[in-house]
């Protein structure tokens, strides 16, 4: 099973999830199902009033999930737009606990932004499938409950990295390097009447993004996507010593591993194996060469999985629109170059190429387009004016 997990990765498509683990493990024995005891790794840490994370501890434990909650219902409750979820109300003390966690999560988030973390907002519509048919594309908006979990996971990943470092263990870090194409980001800022420093500076970029979100919220998702592409992809890298400067530019952190999803991602499972060895005073179960090879392999596996997921999202959008040839849509130009002009329509949220009527258009222009053609297999959507 170990070799199978190494060559697989969890892949999420509109119609089916392909888990890294066999289904009995992924959805049952390793899943935090309600009212079931599970063996787990617990990461404990203290968060100061200013959102600073103090290094914590790791330990093995038996945990129990007392309520199965959904992001959307918890988000509505936290925002004051919905009643308390029934499962939460029935679990003694849980509502107060989640209120406290929400407050702490916001402090963690604010601290990261002050340190230069990037607050991006890209549009990746999720296909809604009913009876095997794509019936809708839904843009998942920012969700306070989901952000709560993300904030605690980011903090836990940092604590885990520093814990293993203190134990003199090598680690596979999650790295987004300082952008090599920073000059392109400078040019992008100038086109919007802004300035960025000559050298990469995540705090300056974060402040630029905040200003642009406030100035032009409609076009901000497209700006976010352009920034993501220019930042470059994330990768897994073997880190042997604290002196290594590799960090996560987008999160504005230096010490960062993936550790919170060992039943979905192989790098997280490797981190757990390292942590368990450190906890029991054993040597690393991997040599540095093995970890280096695994880091390269896991990066390639992740890239392959993401490529499949992107293609499936494009095909799902093309399939949904395939019955609407000739219909007109309101949209915005997201790309304009000699290679082609691209338009993002608002409803349903989808992007395609403008194959006719491209003259005098520039990025950010509002347009009304007609759907001319779709190719489901290729994931192509063609518009014209």
Predicted segments with their positions:
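Electropositive polyanion-binding surfaces
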Residues: 4, 8-355, 359-365, 374-381
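Short, compositionally biased
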Residues: 383-385
